[in-house]
Amino acid sequence: MWPLLHVLWLALVCGSVHTTLSKSDAKKAASKTLLEKTQFSDKPVQDRGLVVTDIKAEDVVLEHRSYCSARARERNFAGEVLGYVTPWNSHGYDVAKVFGSKFTQISPVWLQLKRRGREMFEITGLHDVDQGWMRAVKKHAKGVRIVPRLLFEDWTYDDFRSVLDSEDEIEELSKTVVQVAKNQHFDGFVVEVWSQLLSQKHVGLIHMLTHLAEALHQARLLVILVIPPAVTPGTDQLGMFTHKEFEQLAPILDGFSLMTYDYSTSQQPGPNAPLSWIRACVQVLDPKSQWRSKILLGLNFYGMDYAASKDAREPVIGARYIQTLKDHRPRVVWDSQAAEHFFEYKKNRGGRHVVFYPTLKSLQVRLELARELGVGVSIWELGQGLDYFYDLL
């Protein structure tokens, strides 16, 4: 599917790619330190000639911290924008405070829903809840809603069967969820449960989600569902959540956080989210565009580093990406088919690598696609990106 990438990967394995710095070039590069701007800019990236396909490593390093502070609260994207924040990438907490007005929902990844016995449920992770941070975000962004992710964790098949077949269990589950939202001053939840359950129980899961949504809506709370891609990556086969399920839940739920990333694997390295695949995932879910505004197209603010010799990959977040650019000064290549940038580099003893990581241009193209399709976006996650990305939102 991606001929350019297949050729590149073969070249990496064979060790014949000539874009890597020679030893003499590497010594010259090491003698110079790439500069990073630390001051804000009075212009957004769109007006600074930075949203282009032909990018250079030194320009990314120089500009990535320099966002337009004067427009940090102005929105450029009219649709819904959900941003995830995780405790393990704490920079996301600062991003939410600075750029909160660009988001309609912020989802801290704090909570787990566990079944403790018959009609007994507990939400764990409350020790991570930061009320002061929530107040600070809302102070600077009046309209933003705080909707923590709620993960169904450690549920067995028997747990699901017992709950989905019992109205009393579903009622107790809903009561527990609503009560925690009220106690903690949340605006709702992003529920992650669909991928944890085998397909034969999806009818019962739709029934449970319907009851949960009714209970949350009665308390004036939001419910957004995390859903896997509608087209299985690397195939033309339908995924676990398709138009059939979407059509039943779209009138009931407030949104769908669509996981349109992690397309490639360590065995088949390539782009994180090819543009044609993203489009197909939306069109399969809602071919008639009836509920498109509720679909939140997943945007990854992380990348992947593929090691040719080990047949392995590792996630790349902003700090590591910038350091890799500093250390190796690679030639960054635009894949026009996938609409993503990538580069290759060689470690001293670790062999050759290919890195895919979002850029201003790849993100702009996806935001334009979201506008065209009439969908919102969901970002995983705010602590992993580069600060100047937010000029685009």
Swiss-Prot record:
<dbReference type="GO" id="GO:0005975">
    <property type="term" value="P:carbohydrate metabolic process"/>
</dbReference>
<dbReference type="GO" id="GO:1900016">
    <property type="term" value="P:negative regulation of cytokine production involved in inflammatory response"/>
</dbReference>
<keyword id="KW-0399">Innate immunity</keyword>
<dbReference type="GO" id="GO:0070492">
    <property type="term" value="F:oligosaccharide binding"/>
</dbReference>
<comment type="subunit">
    <text>Interacts with STAB1.</text>
</comment>
<keyword id="KW-0964">Secreted</keyword>
<comment type="similarity">
    <text>Belongs to the glycosyl hydrolase 18 family.</text>
</comment>
<dbReference type="GO" id="GO:0005802">
    <property type="term" value="C:trans-Golgi network"/>
</dbReference>
<dbReference type="GO" id="GO:0005764">
    <property type="term" value="C:lysosome"/>
</dbReference>
<dbReference type="InterPro" id="IPR011583">
    <property type="entry name" value="Chitinase_II/V-like_cat"/>
</dbReference>
<keyword id="KW-0732">Signal</keyword>
<feature type="domain" description="GH18">
    <location>
        <begin position="79"/>
        <end position="393"/>
    </location>
</feature>
<feature type="signal peptide">
    <location>
        <begin position="1"/>
        <end position="19"/>
    </location>
</feature>
<dbReference type="Pfam" id="PF00704">
    <property type="entry name" value="Glyco_hydro_18"/>
</dbReference>
<dbReference type="GO" id="GO:0045087">
    <property type="term" value="P:innate immune response"/>
</dbReference>
<dbReference type="GO" id="GO:0008061">
    <property type="term" value="F:chitin binding"/>
</dbReference>
<dbReference type="GO" id="GO:0012505">
    <property type="term" value="C:endomembrane system"/>
</dbReference>
<dbReference type="InterPro" id="IPR017853">
    <property type="entry name" value="Glycoside_hydrolase_SF"/>
</dbReference>
<protein>
    <recommendedName>
        <fullName>Chitinase domain-containing protein 1</fullName>
    </recommendedName>
</protein>
<dbReference type="GO" id="GO:0005770">
    <property type="term" value="C:late endosome"/>
</dbReference>
<dbReference type="GO" id="GO:0005615">
    <property type="term" value="C:extracellular space"/>
</dbReference>
<dbReference type="InterPro" id="IPR029070">
    <property type="entry name" value="Chitinase_insertion_sf"/>
</dbReference>
<dbReference type="InterPro" id="IPR001223">
    <property type="entry name" value="Glyco_hydro18_cat"/>
</dbReference>
<keyword id="KW-0391">Immunity</keyword>
<comment type="function">
    <text>Saccharide- and LPS-binding protein with possible roles in pathogen sensing and endotoxin neutralization. Ligand-binding specificity relates to the length of the oligosaccharides, with preference for chitotetraose (in vitro).</text>
</comment>
<keyword id="KW-0458">Lysosome</keyword>
